[in-house]
Amino acid sequence: MIGVNGTGKSTLLKILAGIENYDSGTIIKKNGIKIHYLPQNPEFKTDCVWDEIQLVNSKNEHPVAEFELKSILTKLGITDYQSTMSNMSGGQRKRVALALALCTSCDLLLLDEPTNHLDNDMVEWLENYLIRSKSAIFMVTHDRYFLDRVCTKMIELDQGDLYIHNGNYEVYLENKETRIEQEKLAAHKHKNLYKKELEWVRAGVQARGTKSNSRLQRFEELRQKRFKQQEESLKINATMQR
C-alpha cells in the first residue's frame, strides 16, 4: 500500500489487524484466518529476545525448528539471543519484532515499513524470504526497489480513495499521472460550467418555471461540488506543509 504521509496507511493496517476501531463500513474475514501485524513501534510481552521468540513459536500449529529461529535472528543482526529488549535501540527492537513476524504461522502478514533499520544485506535476505513465504503479505513501504521485487500488486491510498495498480512502481507512476491529468481536465470543465451557471444566477431568473428550478438545482449541485474540491485542496496543502 502506497500513498503520501498522513493519508492513513498505518491506520488501515491497524484496523485490519483489529487493533484500531473504524468509523464505518464492514470488514469481512474468512473464518479461522490468522493475521499477524508488524507495527512501526513494537511492544513485547517479555524482556528477553529468546523468551519472546519461544513464546511466539509455542503458539504455532507447527513450531519452527530452533536452528531456523536462530538463523532468522542472525540474518537480521541479532546474534545475542539472550539480549535484554529494554537495553536495545529502537532499530534493534524493530528487527526483533520482524523476526517474530517471520516466525509466526499466519495466513496474512501485515508489515508496516519492514525495511526500516535494515542494511542492504538484510533487505536482500528479507526479499527472498518473503518471496518464498506461503502467507499473503500486505505491507506499507517507501522502499520502491523492495516493493518492485516483492509485491505483485500496489494499492494506492489517496484522499480516502483506493486505486489498484497491477505491475511495478513505474506502472503506478504512469497510472497516477494519467489519473491526475483526467482529474484536472474534469475540474477545468466543471469550473467553466460553474462560471456559466453563476453568471446566469446573478443575471436573475426571469421565470420560475420547471426548467429554471431545475437549472437552479443543478447550480446548487455544482456549487456544492466546487466547495468540496476547494476543501480537499486545502486539506492536501495542509498535509504537504506538515
Predicted feature descriptions by range:
Residues 1-187, 239-242:
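ABC ATP-binding cassette signature C-motif
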Residues 60-62, 178-242:
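Flexible nucleotide-interacting loop at or near the entrance of a catalytic core
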